[in-house]
Regions:
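Trp/Phe/Arg-rich N-terminal binding region typifying the photolyase-homology
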Residues: 1-133
């Protein structure tokens, strides 16, 4: 008899500008896979350097992350918050947690696209799948 692997895979959901649980394609895809979910938000100062957010935008981001963290906590999870280069932090968090796949919402602004490309390249080098929505 062959032993079945009962370990449930874990996917990392990288929250970017889609700071909500409802109507979130990345999160929805992870739920449909029936996997464990590791929710992560990275504040990457390099991505925002060209268009530095003002006080109102920073306030909104703080409130949105606070709300998202609270919603995730109510479901028994914890939102991981980190500051630094997403292309370094996402692969590190993924490797440290045995992540099989990283799911995220695409952005279309030039700095966001550049960050996406760097993150995808780093994850590809680490042998971790990505899927964007």
């Amino acid at each position: 008899m062959i032993a079945e692997n009962t370990t449930t895979p874990t996917f990392l959901v990288w929250f970017r500008k889609d700071l909500r649980l409802r109507d979130n394609p990345s999160l929805h895809a992870a739920v449909l896979e029936g996997c464990k979910i590791l929710p992560v938000f990275i504040w990457d100062p390099e991505e925002g350097r060209q268009w530095s957010p003002g006080a109102a935008s920073r306030w909104w981001l703080h409130q949105a992350l606070k709300s998202l963290g609270s919603d995730i906590s109510k479901l028994g999870g914890e939102l991981i918050l980190a500051k630094g280069k997403a292309a370094e932090l996402i692969p590190k968090i993924a490797k440290d947690n045995g992540i099989l796949k990283v799911l995220y919402g695409r952005t279309y602004d030039p700095p966001g696209l550049a960050t996406q490309e760097r993150v995808e390249e780093a994850l590809d080098e680490a042998g971790i799948d990505t899927e964007s929505f």
